[in-house]
Amino acid sequence: MSVRRHIGNPEYLTRRIPQNPRYQHVKSRLDTGNSMTKYIEKLEEIKKNYRYKKDELFKRLKVTTFAQLVIQVASLSDQTLEVTAEEIQRLEDNDSATSEPDAEITAKTNGNGSPGEQSPSPVQFINSEGAGDFSRSTLQSVISGVGELDLDKGLVKKTEPNTKDKPYPDCPFLLLDVRDRDSYQQCHIVGAYSYPIATLSRTMNPYSNDILEYKNAHGKIIILYDDDERLASQAATTMCERGFENLFMLSGGLKVLAQKFPEGLITGSLPASCQQALPPGSARKRSSPKVPPLPAENKWRFTPEDLKKIEYYLEEDQGPADNPSRLSQANASGRDAKVPGTRSGQNLPAGGPASHQNPRSLGSGHLQGKPWK
């Protein structure tokens, strides 16, 4: 019995299609559910952005958890400032109301004596023992609550420093930047203190007063961060070995923080190692003059615009977890686009970044006109 031969070479079925490196960044449009591709991509992302080690002494804090903590602290601090401002205004109104009748009594008594007494002559005033004490507050004026400072209260204005230039009062976390001083001045997270890792090698006073205040304190934590976990992991391990139990490390550092929150949390210009590299072949290289990096501002609190941007990117990061598939998002957006008065303008808050679009706001016309996107 003869062996039946196949038509053609069977090696053609096992031959792999050559891949073009120019289009390796292009992903499949239909990508739903769990797959081996997603699992491999997740492992590659972990190896690329994180440096996990066995038996880590310190705890890790996710970037999204840190953003939620910042929003809560800022909102509570703003409410406390509003209540404090109202109380100060009410106390000032009460003080001004009580000082007016006292000022009238003092004006009638001329600052000394009773209202019925006559003012002494200039000669008697000079020869008297109390010469030169006319402008001073008398016993009666002091008892009634009017003194020298109260009389000059309207002339001298109090110069109080702006509270927005100071850190949040009773902040539950202490944020430490373990990079060198130059990197801190170029770029850092708003509200972070500069604490280079070389400070831990000091023989005397390696910790500041703030660190000693937050060390193992109830309801407070210490957070360390750097660019890519190289320095922060070493500093966190050393501090944990020295007895710090409430120490956390920002997982991923500025590199992951810049990917998930490009605006709002960081002040200054990001270093080149933390910026996202464009995929090959996605855009042509244009010869443009390099702009010098802007230094970081001396900023300790987040503005309302910063908080809106943080909330926007936080919703974008948590959005795919709420919706199981992209196909359902596209269908829902197509139905919304047919209704006059679409709700696409409501997805982006006022003051948020205009360059990032929400996938829910894309209409069906965009999907049909540009199928390659």
UniProtKB/Swiss-Prot annotation:
The modification Phosphoserine is found at residues 96, 99, 114, 121. Residues 169-266 form the Rhodanese domain. SMART domains: RHOD. Its main location: cytoplasm. Belongs to the CEP41 family. Residues 89-127, 275-300, 315-373 are annotated as: Disordered. Required during ciliogenesis for tubulin glutamylation in cilium. Probably acts by participating in the transport of TTLL6, a tubulin polyglutamylase, between the basal body and the cilium. Pfam families: Rhodanese (PF00581). GO terms for cellular component: centriole; centrosome; ciliary basal body; cilium; cytoplasm. Residues 107-127 have a biased composition (Polar residues). Keywords: Cell projection, Ciliopathy, Cilium, Cilium biogenesis/degradation, Cytoplasm, Cytoskeleton, Methylation, Phosphoprotein, Protein transport, Transport. Found in a complex with TTLL6. InterPro entries: CEP41, Rhodanese-like_dom, Rhodanese-like_dom_sf. Coiled coil: none annotated. It is found in: Cytoplasm, Cytoskeleton, Microtubule organizing center, Centrosome; Cell projection, Cilium; Cytoplasm, Cytoskeleton, Cilium basal body. This is Centrosomal protein of 41 kDa. The modification Phosphothreonine is found at residue 109. The gene is CEP41. The modification Omega-N-methylarginine is found at residue 343. CDD domains: RHOD. It comes from the Eukaryota. GO terms for biological process: cilium assembly; protein polyglutamylation; protein transport.
